[in-house]
Amino acid sequence: MKHKAHLVLAISLLLTLAAPVQAATPKAGAKCNKAGTTATANGKKFTCIKSGTKLVWNKGVAIKKPSPVATPTSVPSPTPTPTPTPTPTPTPLIPAEPKSFADIERNYQSVAYWAWKKSKDKIESSKRTFVDFENIIAPNSGILNKNPIVAFDATSRLFSDFVQPSKFYSISYSYEDLNWAQSKFEELFSDPELLREIQSPNRGGPNQARNVCPSPERCHSSSPNTNRAGVSIILVGYTPTRANNLGETNGDLQSHEFTHVIQDQQFVKSPREMNGLASLKHYVPWWLVEGGADFGGIASTHPDSFQRYSDARLRNVNNVPRRDAAWYENFINPVSNQEWIPLGPTGEIYTVGFVITEIFTALKGPGAQMEIVRQIAQGKSMDEAFENVFGTPWKSAVPIIARVIATERAKR
């Protein structure tokens, strides 16, 4: 028993001596056993150093916590979007340019495009030739087209090869301003002898302002007059309720009337001056006077878009009456211009006249109609002027034009 007790005591002492000092929690300044030994505690790393003759733990160095390394997230590769194949815009089919009235009869569909194209080219390549313009608004009135000079400018360029006014005025007035407008017109016109001709009972009558504006509800017409000094005046009726009427706001009306002004100007200083300025229709076919002005208005308003020109021209084309070729032939070239009198109010001189002028323009450009007017002013007949311009006898062209209009109108 005594021997076992000694054995147990010996083992206990041996285990105590074998346990390392570092097993104790290190503390700055506390005794350690071996220089260079390290130990960690409370987030610090301590090193056993020699201080004098002693070995002690230093103050320790804080252990940096490792930054967490983000686990990369896999990004799915984008699915490529297929690039759509562009659908080619179909190129509009441009019809062959007509060179003769026979070409027109074979392919009337070429007329609208080439009349528009030749007008567009003329406007874009020319400069306006009038210089002095004044826009006058009556005291109790307004104006539907706020910037009429744009329309006058385009029409001036369309007919830049022809004489244009030295000075012209546009007078906008309502029914309330009727007397004021007539007085202003007579003051500016300043040609008493010609004014008496214009105001004769078989022509315009004594009151040009009232002709344009006969009542408050019907004050939306317009009319030009030109004196022998080349001064032109356009009277424009004003009805504010017509602000949504496109033809009165987009320049069409102004271009129509300025075409008349240029027609007038061809008679200034001409052999037929007095009667021609008193009434163009004394010499020029009525359908050419009004149809030519309708064409000038639409072509000058829409040189930038064949589609808009096409839409606008339908106002005339769709209102052409359905008649046979014989009726149209007599309408175009009647025995007497008195036959046109009943057709003024019903519109044929505008609608049929537009179609004929469009045909002229498709063949020879926008100046064709005005050159006929100019030659008539100089004393030529319609037959002579037409043949000079087109190289074809008028009587040969009339039946072709009549057949074309009758055939095309029958399709609508």
Set out the residue ranges of the language-model regions:
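Secretory targeting and sorting signals
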Residues: 2-23
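Secreted, propeptide-processed cysteine-rich mini-domains
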Residues: 24-39
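Non-catalytic architectural context of zinc metalloproteases
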Residues: 88-247, 251-252, 282, 344, ...
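Beta/coil-rich, acidic/histidine-enriched accessory regions frequently appended to metallopeptidases
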Residues: 100-107, 150, 374, 378-412
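Zinc-dependent metallopeptidase catalytic helix centered on the HExxH motif
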Residues: 210-316
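Active-site-proximal alpha-helical
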Residues: 296-300, 315-395
